Amino acid sequence: MIFLLSVEQEYDELNHVMKIFQDTMMRLRYSAIPVVAAPHGYTLGGGCELCLQCDAVVPYSETYIGLVEAGIGLLPGGGGMKEMILRASDKFKKNDVEVNILQEYFMNIGMGKTATSGFEGYELDYFIKGRDITVMNKKNQINIAKQKALNLFDAGYTKPIERNDIKVLGKQALGMLYVGVDSLRAGDYISDHDKKIANKIAYVLCGGDLSQPTKVSEQYLLELEREAFISLCGERKTLERMQYMLKNGKPLRN
């Protein structure tokens, strides 16, 4: 659907579809009852974004999870960017070099890094230590996930409050990420289109070109994410990547 709407340049309809996708993810995140995901196998792109919104995740050990949208010329558009920014913000501490923390997320998303197991997912911050549970026996996965949801409910689960205190770093950090992208292009490690995608990812991660670090809402970040996603859908080379993936099942480097 995304590819067809992009080819036909139906950008208003595309915006509508992506807004529904984001709203669905937010309803999942702010459900009145606990939501637990039990991923296994390939959990990529939108599947990963869905897991990021849940109250807990119970992955099977053989779970391959990641935000891989850059490989088809896009960026995560269903709340994945928003959630990564939120998690980075929660890691910021006084006197930290905050841009270094943000850069890790930038590299993960820009390079489409995929965790190759239900254990590596913690290192990439797709899963959260102390909250999520990786299971070795797939036969037990659903039962453990169900028990996790029941435990959350029995502990007095309450509907989360939508966040409006997410710290974004603005144009100073954005400039530093841009310099890094320029260096990669100058070294011929990435293509011109890779550079364009990376710059869009950097822009969203930094909350835009705000003059100084600022605390923003989830809705603000979702709008930035959606605008950047749709703008990339209008790029010819993105369409070529999407078409190639649909036809051949592997990414195109252009």
Q: What positions do the PLM features span?
A:
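Phosphate/diphosphate-binding loops
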Residues: D12-V35, Y42-C48, A88, D96-Q103
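Gly/Pro- and small hydrophobic-enriched strand-loop and loop-to-helix capping segments
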Residues: D55-G77, D125-Q141
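Glycine- (often His-adjacent) and acidic-residue-rich active-site loop
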Residues: M1-I20, G73
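Active-site-adjacent scaffolding segments
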Residues: Y30, A38, S61, G71, ...
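Intrinsically disordered, low-complexity segments enriched in small/flexible residues
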Residues: L86-S117, E123, I128-N254
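Glycine-rich beta-to-alpha active-site loop
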Residues: M26-I72
